[in-house]
Amino acid sequence: MSTWLLPENIADVLPSEARKIEELRRRLLDRFRSYGYEMVMPPLLEYLESLLTSGGNELRLRTFKLVDQVSGRTLGLRADMTPQVARIDAHLLNRQGVTRLCYAGPVLHTRPRGLHASREQLQIGAEIYGHAGLEADQEIQQLMLDALHLTGLKKIRLDLCHAGVLAALFARDAAAAERGEALYEALAGKDVPRLNELTDDLGADTRAALRALPRLYGDASVLDDARRQLPALPEIARALDDLAHLAAQVKDAEVAIDLADLRGYAYHSGAMFAAYVDGVPNAVAHGGRYDHVGQAYGRARPATGFSLDLREIARISPVEARGAAILAPWKQDDALRAAVGALRDAGEVVIQALPGHDHVLDEFACDRALVERDGAWVIEPR
């Protein structure tokens, strides 16, 4: 086998892509900071049980596992940074009020999550802890849309769902709860034949409600249909009210209600959302409320957040990251060295052409040149 081959769905990041990823990363982290989010950097590697406190079987299957040569315990390479950030909030920071945290780092998946998806993603996201009200959900929702607009994406569609609807149906019907994992998979995949098979022997109300969920998709008027077709349970009514409120706050994106879009249902506890753009089959960002995740670390806190894959965003973003630069000659000249140093200190990119390579400009747009005029080094347009 060739020594230069990489595993399937794993790829190097070359200069042009890396520059674009870094440009987007800086934009997003700066925007998070403008909202008051503090950055944290959890480790890539942890004990497996710490990484799998939530997320169900899906997260377990996506997590790479290995044996620690020091302790003999099983370690995991993180597949999602959200549980790690929840651990930091619950166990290390231990604050009592509202905490806003953000992060950016690689995650690894045993299998790709979607069509053309990489198994090594660069996850970036933001989380709010300590506030159970819809204000936190609204802020996270708006921050996610702000972030996507900063990347230059257009015609964004925000799909809203709520984990409370399915949870209420399971709480009322023990038989449905017992096959919850299978029902979740059928709903998330909109596998109607499988859903019909799983619900054949359930109570009439539960069966009708579960079979209605894949059809409850569309604009905000779908919520009125949901009130008519779903059981009149207080938990379902509150969930639909939450979605109506969040949908009404969105002014800069199309909003759709999809009560079967249950990505991450295993650890979500409230409103869930995913962002889509034309021409991309998978969600470009997703998030939601997950109030119980911190419980495994000794302190359950209200929490909501979102994340996205920067590598995927960079692939579809129209942002141009080819930076302007100044071309300078390579010459043993103290005045030239001082001029180049001063320009770099001022934030300019200065590329000194090595002897014999004056025509090679790499991928920078050298729109200016540093030239000697009357004994002084000055900048001129190229």
Swiss-Prot record:
It is found in: Cytoplasm. GO terms for molecular function: histidine-tRNA ligase activity. The keyword Membrane does not apply. InterPro entries: aa-tRNA-synth_II/BPL/LPL, HisRS-like_core, HisRS/HisZ, HisZ. The keyword Cytoplasm applies. Gene3D superfamilies: Bira Bifunctional Protein, Domain 2. Keywords: Amino-acid biosynthesis, Cytoplasm, Histidine biosynthesis. Pathway: Amino-acid biosynthesis; L-histidine biosynthesis; L-histidine from 5-phospho-alpha-D-ribose 1-diphosphate: step 1/9. Pfam families: tRNA-synt_His. One of its GO terms (cellular component) is cytoplasm. GO terms for biological process: histidyl-tRNA aminoacylation; L-histidine biosynthetic process. Disulfide bonds: none annotated. Required for the first step of histidine biosynthesis. May allow the feedback regulation of ATP phosphoribosyltransferase activity by histidine. Belongs to the class-II aminoacyl-tRNA synthetase family. HisZ subfamily. Heteromultimer composed of HisG and HisZ subunits. This function is generally fulfilled by the C-terminal part of HisG, which is missing in some bacteria such as this one. This is ATP phosphoribosyltransferase regulatory subunit.
